[in-house]
Amino acid sequence: MKKIAPFLSFFLFSLVCFSQTIPQEYRPQYHYTAPKNWVNDPNGLVYLDGEYHLFYQYNPFGNVWGHMSWGHAVSKDLNRWETLPVALPEFDNPDGTQTMIFSGCAVIDSLNTSGFFEKGFTKGMVAVFTSHIEGKAQHQSIAYSADKGRTWKRYDKNPVLDLGMKDFRDPNVIWYPEKQVWIMTVVKPLEYTAQFYESKDLKTWSLLSEFGKQGDMTKIWECPSLTKVPVEGSNESKWVLMISSGHRQKNYLAMQYFVGDFDGKTFTPQKQNEILYVDEGKDFYAAIPFSNLPKSHTKPIMIGWINDWEYAREIPTGDTWRGGFSVAREFSLKKTAEGFRLVQQPVAQLKSAQKEAFRIKNKVIDGVYNLPFKGEVFDLEVELRPHRAKVVTLNVFQSQGEATVIRYDVATQELSLDRTKSGQVNFHPRFSSVERVKVPLKEGKLSLRLLADKSILELFVQNGEQALTEWVFPIQHEGEISLTSEGGKANISALSIHTIR
Ligand code: FRU
């Protein structure tokens, strides 16, 4: 026995390592994923007392959608997340049906408008969510927590808003100081309509107005939010209404936004000649903004679900976990000749966890340039001058015959993100895809920032004027990176790569 003991323990050790490494092949390192099981939309993004909360749609029992409950994670720096126990679980109704906790938001009721908390208590958290009874009803309900979201009580007079509809969901609530009221934005998905309600106590809601039947109506409307957003280089702000709905490419999902004015009752959009999308990739959906951010954040911050319902259930991340969340992104508006446009960037906090791995300046490329860095977890920033080149490409997650290709065509000003040869693509007929967006050069320059994290790519173009988020599932994991120029020489003005600790 003595003799075989070391072999036996080595065998058991290998077994444990093996079973842990296989499903972890695609596990992101700095994007939040639940330790196990299925996740979808972020819910109740709220800041309180030094903690950022990420509640999210979660199935505690498996890695497919079902038993929807609110999972919970917290972070002190929007960077590293700690998973906490399920906050709001699905529950049984007296008639034998179940109520699932669908998407919603969380607010801090610092004036105790709800009366749920002790007199003078300023840290009460209230969750506003859709109570969903499968095949029967969707209405809005509330729950409250006096211990920073660790334990919750459901309001005993739920639901607080019920239109008797089967599809009526995803409340997002803001405090509107001018009227000292809460304003809820919620959608009737099948009618492509958002509704605005107001309440003094989070319990009684009255309809203010409706907005809808315009913009992208190729898919149902979900997860709306209304946010006051600063306009860069001015003291002005505008209101942004975001709606999760269809994608520029038919039958995929994305988020669209409208910019306009909100007077406490009605949202009036600016004239827009085109549909505006928050992120041009296939995998950014259901993002909502944080509530109650401290003043030190001068811009709103959002987090989105990385996935597309088209194939979300089949992404090959192994048996343990499925779905993930974007990094926290701050956003603002830019005034352009065509109207206001969204600009988004990863929050600065991300930098604090990084270490510089490589940097170059003013390098001419003529053909292929292989970077002296390999990896699948990095933050790459590059400023390129195509000069005489007709096409420049950035190739990442590259191995023999495999790469995700970011390509810029100077003549057409088209930037594309091509994952058709990125690795595993056949698990679903609609996964293999190329995104295309128009990106004019700025003073002859193209600037890209790519957050790569095992299986997630978040690409920010021209300092956040465009964003593209996608899953990719490399097979060979060589992690090579190259830049190419075709048809002439191009110049890399600056390039840096940071690894993430
Ligand atoms: C969006 C969504 C929401 C709903 C939730 C259910 O992804 O369909 O409309 O509340 O997911 O999990």
How would you name each of these model-derived features?
Residues 1-24:
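Bacterial Sec-dependent N-terminal signal peptides
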Residues 15-16, 214, 471, 475:
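Residues in and immediately flanking transmembrane alpha helices
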Residues 20-171, 175-221, 230-280, 295-299, ...:
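Beta-rich carbohydrate-recognition and catalytic domains
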Residues 222-224, 287:
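Repeated scaffold domains used in trafficking and secretory/extracellular systems
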Residues 227-228, 291:
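Short glycine/serine- and small hydrophobic-enriched flexible loop segments
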Residues 233, 261-274, 278-286, 290-501:
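Beta-rich accessory regions
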